[in-house]
């Protein structure tokens, strides 16, 4: 990005596993970033290594089921009330084009990353968004962010389901990104 003349980004955004990527990009400080938004972002597991392997395996197998079974199986395996058939078909198509190795590495790296210790001082404003209905699911992630990054601004979204903001309410997403506080 610097080679292209960019010296600063307004924001990086990541949802779920992408939240872990957004956080690591902000912590890396390779370019100035004003805002880092983790939307239901996954924080590093605070569990024994062997337990994290089983969690990664479960997640991987769920994705492989979706990859193999297509839309019909995705409808049975996941809460899909908010998504249209076209949305689910898109997910099935994307999964079908991902290799098994790519899916495994995705879960392994996004769930088991390390935050530098001590946490570096950054000028980036951190934001953690989660929906009203997923507070229990995100309890450990929220506690982790509060302990490691006490300056984080937390926002509770309307009930959209996990990862529903961008897909289901793109206008609200655009408004929220535009209105991030400096």
Give the ranges of each region predicted by the language model.
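Short alpha-helix in the alpha/beta-hydrolase fold that links the catalytic acid
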Residues: 124, 138-146
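Acidic catalytic loop of the alpha/beta-hydrolase fold
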Residues: 132-137
């Amino acid at each position: 990005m610097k080679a292209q003349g960019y010296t600063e980004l307004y924001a990086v955004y990541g949802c779920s596993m992408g939240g872990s990527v957004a956080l690591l990009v902000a912590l890396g400080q390779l370019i100035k970033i004003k805002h880092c938004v983790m939307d239901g972002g996954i924080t590093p597991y605070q569990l024994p290594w062997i337990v994290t392997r089983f969690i990664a395996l479960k997640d991987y197998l769920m994705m492989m089921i979706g990859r193999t079974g297509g839309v019909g199986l995705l409808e049975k395996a996941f809460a899909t009330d908010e998504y249209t058939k076209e949305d689910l078909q898109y997910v099935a198509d994307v999964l079908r084009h991902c290799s098994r190795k790519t899916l495994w590495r995705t879960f392994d790296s996004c769930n088991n990353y390390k935050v530098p210790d001590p946490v570096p001082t950054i000028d980036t404003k951190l934001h953690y968004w989660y929906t009203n209905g997923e507070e229990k699911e995100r309890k450990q992630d929220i506690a982790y962010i509060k302990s490691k990054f006490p300056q984080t601004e937390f926002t509770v979204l309307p009930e959209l389901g996990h990862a529903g903001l961008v897909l289901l309410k793109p206008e609200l997403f655009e408004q929220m990104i535009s209105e991030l506080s400096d």
